[in-house]
């Protein structure tokens, strides 16, 4: 399955999600490869850091050297693509090959507007997968304080956008994600019993229900 993790607006946390998902899949025994199409190359940097620190499982991250869609479709396992608006040509090509698009949306009106524009681009410019491309959005970097209304308001606004499914599993803004990246590790590798780790397991299990278990 080809999952493209994308958003028009910067700062959505897509590279962090892509990295944690890639390691989560690998830790469940899945064959997974990643494509880093973002000029910032965060996913590639994290994979290189893991290699230097000899952290297992090792991640296999590729850049594009040929026709992108052919590369993506050549892999038999799970494919994760990290791409943003800074590489619009690659984004459009990746979206054309995607089985599903995962859109992380921080809790703000500006991010809702960006998501709305992103959906317009998909419908206008992207040749849909013949089997249908699933469009999934979720609130990323959600407020940990439940009394702050922006998270719920963002989720409600996303639910009003046509043609998109809103995942109920939020990823909250926790320092564990930021700190673990500096070590080339995921939040569930460094702090397996933390709130952030448990929230991510729930989130990933919803995306891959056939792997709905915490790895031993």
Language-model regions: role of each:
Residues 154-185, 200:
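Beta-strand-loop-alpha "switch" segments that mediate conformational coupling across diverse proteins
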Residues 40-42, 110, 144, 174:
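Active-site loop signature of alpha/beta-hydrolase-fold enzymes
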Residues 2-8, 12, 23-92, 156, ...:
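P-loop/Walker-type NTP enzyme "switch/lid" segment
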Residues 184-216:
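NTP-binding/hydrolysis catalytic cores, primarily Walker-type P-loop NTPases
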Residues 16-17:
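Hydrophobic positions on the alpha1 helix immediately C-terminal to the Walker A/P-loop
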Residues 3, 28, 33, 84-169:
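Conserved catalytic-core segment of NTP-binding enzymes
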Residues 24-28, 121, 206, 210:
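Active-site catalytic microenvironments for nucleophilic, acid-base chemistry
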């Amino acid at each position: 399955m080809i999952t493209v993790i994308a958003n028009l607006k910067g700062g959505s946390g897509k590279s962090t999600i892509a990295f944690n998902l890639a390691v989560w899949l690998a830790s469940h025994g899945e064959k997974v490869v990643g494509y880093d199409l973002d000029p910032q190359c965060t996913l590639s940097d994290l994979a290189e850091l893991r290699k230097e620190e000899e952290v297992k499982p090792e991640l296999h991250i590729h850049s594009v050297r040929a026709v992108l869609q052919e590369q993506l479709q050549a892999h038999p396992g799970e494919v994760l693509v990290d791409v943003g608006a800074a590489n619009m040509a690659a984004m459009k090509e990746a979206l054309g090959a995607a089985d599903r698009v995962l859109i992380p949306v921080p809790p703000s009106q500006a991010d809702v507007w960006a998501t709305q524009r992103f959906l317009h681009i998909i419908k206008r410019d992207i040749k849909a997968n013949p089997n249908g491309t699933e469009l999934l959005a979720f609130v990323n970097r959600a407020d940990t304080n439940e009394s702050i209304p922006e998270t719920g308001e963002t989720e409600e606004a996303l639910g009003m956008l046509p043609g998109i499914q809103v995942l109920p599993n939020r990823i909250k803004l926790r320092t564990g994600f930021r700190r673990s990246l500096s070590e080339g590790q995921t939040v569930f590798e460094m702090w397996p019993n933390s709130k952030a780790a448990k929230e991510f397991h729930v989130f990933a299990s919803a995306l891959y229900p056939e792997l709905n278990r915490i790895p031993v």
